[in-house]
């Protein structure tokens, strides 16, 4: 999470005012902490009641990623995918972050396994 943008009070501008929500997290975040905040964010999505979801999937919260200090594991990404799947929405995923090549594929695979769980995935 960048520390120079995405502040809680940033709620959008112009016609988009009120349609942006940020959930700032600290410098040290583990999977449990991440899921607690993800749960709140998904509640906001549910309240909005969209007909589809476009998800920007950052895999840089992974443990050992050179861009950060968070410690999410492949199991955490699996759980995150399952949580998103519970929205039961048509979803487009755009992968946009993740720089530790040794774990990037595994983390992506686990997220998509979680996301596909309602369709017979893991």
Question: Which stretches of residues belong to each language-model region?
Answer:
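A general "terminal functional-core" signal
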Residues: 1-122
């Amino acid at each position: 999470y960048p520390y120079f943008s995405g502040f809680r009070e940033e709620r959008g501008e112009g016609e988009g005012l009120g349609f942006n929500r940020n959930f700032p997290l600290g410098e040290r975040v583990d999977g449990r902490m991440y899921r607690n905040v993800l749960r709140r964010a998904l509640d906001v999505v549910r309240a909005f009641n969209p007909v589809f979801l476009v998800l920007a999937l950052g895999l840089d919260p992974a443990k050992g990623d050179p861009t950060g200090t968070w410690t999410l594991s492949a199991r955490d990404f699996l759980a995150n995918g399952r949580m998103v799947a519970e929205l039961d929405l048509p979803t487009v995923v755009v992968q946009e972050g993740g720089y530790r090549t040794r774990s990037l594929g595994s983390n992506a695979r686990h997220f998509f396994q979680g996301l596909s769980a309602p369709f017979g995935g893991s």
